[in-house]
């Protein structure tokens, strides 16, 4: 999830393009599949239609607010409520935190969920997990060593249901972005030596384990790090980290597993010069995340403007040389979901957002936001239009992975509720508003 600092990135210009997908060429990494005859998933011909398993093995307050509401002492204030998993574990202590998290892990997702995902016409899941599941810093309060067994269960459930999997390193020590979904909010020091060294230890373990023969028919990508916040990071060091992960996989392990790199919120084609064919690289996916709800300017757009931007997300990647997938996106046209911007921050949409020097203004009401039965027909149709435009755009290239499959209370971020309410196509190819983008 792309949260509190992301509004800084909302001013990117999305220029509409009309080029077709480029012809197969040895200069395009995504087209080396046929040349190398590798067994990996061919993202140029096999479309991804997936969903994220968010808020399970790595907590996000807005996905499971009940875990965090247990700390509330004042119905009018979020004071004292942990803002992320780090502070959740710190507040409870290791024994109680482990007990509560075990109860969450064992119930929030079960095998039936993965069967339901497949039955809904999807073919892939992306599973976020934090570094602390495998190893921690001495000062970390996290519960560790327990999440991996659930990850392995999920991979087996996926295999049994006919789903493919991305294993996504979603949180790095020191945080890579300052978002609560990294485990530690308002920090971004993962490229400091101690933190980077531990990140490398963890990613080496993930690459080694999930590139083994028994996983290769199901795990079709390992994401080296989720959403590194490019504007506040040393991009040269980030590129070195990406190169490290790629080299370890190809040269040390000799594996043809797929490497997934997030775009770090850089512009289209930025990564064309990284892990290139000329350097001998292949089997690389660039992961783009797209939202229009984390700045007041975005929230104030008309539905036609929202749809136009969504369409440009599709055309914008047509000339990128790597495989590309939209690894996160949602139906959100508001930021009204409780704690979507973080515990204690409010919503820009209704003007209640405050953080540091940033304020907000009233755009619309958040009342009854999570009760679809109260929505106007116009609002329902607008959400459906927005979803369909994104589906059309993302299927111009490698496909999409919706964020996320389920939450405790939200609608715009909950694929189950959206499908049940008729706001997400079923089947996923159904269109009430065809040809919005004119592709």
UniProtKB/Swiss-Prot annotation:
The active site is at residues 227, 328. It is found in: Secreted. GO terms for molecular function: glucan exo-1,3-beta-glucosidase activity. The keyword Signal applies. InterPro entries: Glyco_hydro_5 (IPR001547), Glyco_hydro_5_CS (IPR018087), Glycoside_hydrolase_SF (IPR017853), Glycosyl_hydrolase_5 (IPR050386). Belongs to the glycosyl hydrolase 5 (cellulase A) family. This is Glucan 1,3-beta-glucosidase. It comes from Lachancea kluyveri (strain ATCC 58438 / CBS 3082 / BCRC 21498 / NBRC 1685 / JCM 7257 / NCYC 543 / NRRL Y-12651).
């Amino acid at each position: 999830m792309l949260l509190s600092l992301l509004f800084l990135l909302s001013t990117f210009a999305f220029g509409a393009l009309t080029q077709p997908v480029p012809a197969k060429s040895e200069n395009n990494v995504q087209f080396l599949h046929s040349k190398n005859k590798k067994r990996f998933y061919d993202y140029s011909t096999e479309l991804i239609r997936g969903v994220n398993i968010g808020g399970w093995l790595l907590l996000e307050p807005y996905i499971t607010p009940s875990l965090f509401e247990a700390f509330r002492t004042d119905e009018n204030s979020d004071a004292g409520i942990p803002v992320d998993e780090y502070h959740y574990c710190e507040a409870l202590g290791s024994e109680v935190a482990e007990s509560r998290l075990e109860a969450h892990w064992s119930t929030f997702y079960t095998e039936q969920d993965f069967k339901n995902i497949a039955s809904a016409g999807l073919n892939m899941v992306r599973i976020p997990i934090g570094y602390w599941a495998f190893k921690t810093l001495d000062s970390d309060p996290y519960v560790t060593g327990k999440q991996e067994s659930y990850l392995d269960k999920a991979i087996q459930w996926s295999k049994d249901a006919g789903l493919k999997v991305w294993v996504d390193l979603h949180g790095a020590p020191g945080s890579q972005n300052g978002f609560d979904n990294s485990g530690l909010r308002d920090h971004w020091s993962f490229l400091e030596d101690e933190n980077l060294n531990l990140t490398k230890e963890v990613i080496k373990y993930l690459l080694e384990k999930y590139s083994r023969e028994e996983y290769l028919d199901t795990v079709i990508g390992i994401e080296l790090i989720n959403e590194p916040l490019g504007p506040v990071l040393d991009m040269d060091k980030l590129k070195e980290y990406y190169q490290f992960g790629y080299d370890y996989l190809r040269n040390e392990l000799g594996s043809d597993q797929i490497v997934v790199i997030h775009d770090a919120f850089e512009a289209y084609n930025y990564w064309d010069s990284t892990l290139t064919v000329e350097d001998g690289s292949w089997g690389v996916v660039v992961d783009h995340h797209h939202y229009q709800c984390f700045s007041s300017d975005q929230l104030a757009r008309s539905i036609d403007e929202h749809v136009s931007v969504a369409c440009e997300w599709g055309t914008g990647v047509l000339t990128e040389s790597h495989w590309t997938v939209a690894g996160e996106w949602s139906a959100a046209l508001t930021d009204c979901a409780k704690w979507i911007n973080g515990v204690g921050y409010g919503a820009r949409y209704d003007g209640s957002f405050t953080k540091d020097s940033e304020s907000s203004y009233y755009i619309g009401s958040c009342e009854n936001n999570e009760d679809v039965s109260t929505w106007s027909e116009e609002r329902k149709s607008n959400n459906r239009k927005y979803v369909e435009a994104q589906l059309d755009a993302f299927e111009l290239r490698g496909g999409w992975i919706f964020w996320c499959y389920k939450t405790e209370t939200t609608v715009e971020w909950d694929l189950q509720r959206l499908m049940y309410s008729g706001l997400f196509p079923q089947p996923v190819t159904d269109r009430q508003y065809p040809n919005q983008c004119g592709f």
